[in-house]
């Protein structure tokens, strides 16, 4: 990570958060062949809306998602479907240039070198991607069992809690920390004490 500088910004509202992070993404997209890591969930929705509204050039950009359920990628609740709906189908990124964690995880690790910008969200129990509290800081991309709290939190995206996948493939904390720049987005009072 460049310079290891920790900067905390408290913003007025959720939409300002999306705009501020969109500024960082827009700057990153000016690099010759930018590589980004992107999150899912409710927190980055304002970011994705703002990025679509800015009509930026994504044609040389490669993206990697932090995680994906162990689920058919075309399932309506997969993160692949989420990202297509929120961003990829609405900007000029080539389908061959966006990637989700896959098995074998070692092959995915080989693809994700030299990340320019990694955007993260944080779960209500402090998980980053699907790295639950207590995950090793050296962890790599791997298949994980989801905690009961994470399954419960994510049930809002499914018709019932029984439909929430019990496993996911996630980038590890060690993998994430190799990014040149990291931005952690957090929104809401429930994230204040994490």
Describe these PLM feature segments.
Residues 2-5, 58-119:
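Ligand-binding beta-strand-loop-alpha-helix segment within the catalytic cores
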């Amino acid at each position: 990570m460049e310079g290891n500088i920790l900067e905390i910004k408290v913003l007025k509202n959720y939409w300002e958060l999306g705009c501020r992070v969109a500024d960082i993404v827009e700057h990153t997209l000016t690099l010759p062949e930018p590589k980004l890591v992107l999150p899912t969930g409710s927190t980055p929705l304002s970011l994705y809306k703002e990025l679509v509204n800015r009509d930026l050039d994504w044609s040389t950009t490669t993206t990697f998602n932090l995680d994906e359920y162990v689920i058919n990628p075309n399932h309506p609740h997969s993160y692949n479907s989420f990202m297509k709906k929120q961003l990829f189908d609405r900007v000029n990124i080539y389908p061959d240039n966006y990637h989700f964690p896959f098995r074998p995880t070692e092959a995915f690790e080989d693809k994700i070198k030299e990340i320019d910008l990694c955007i993260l969200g944080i779960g209500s129990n402090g998980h980053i991607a699907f790295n639950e509290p207590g995950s090793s800081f050296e962890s790599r991309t791997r298949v994980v069992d989801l905690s009961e709290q994470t399954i419960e939190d994510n049930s809002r995206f499914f018709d019932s809690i029984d439909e929430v996948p019990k496993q996911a493939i996630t980038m590890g904390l060690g993998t994430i920390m190799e990014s040149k720049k990291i931005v952690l987005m957090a929104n809401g009072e429930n994230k204040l004490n994490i």
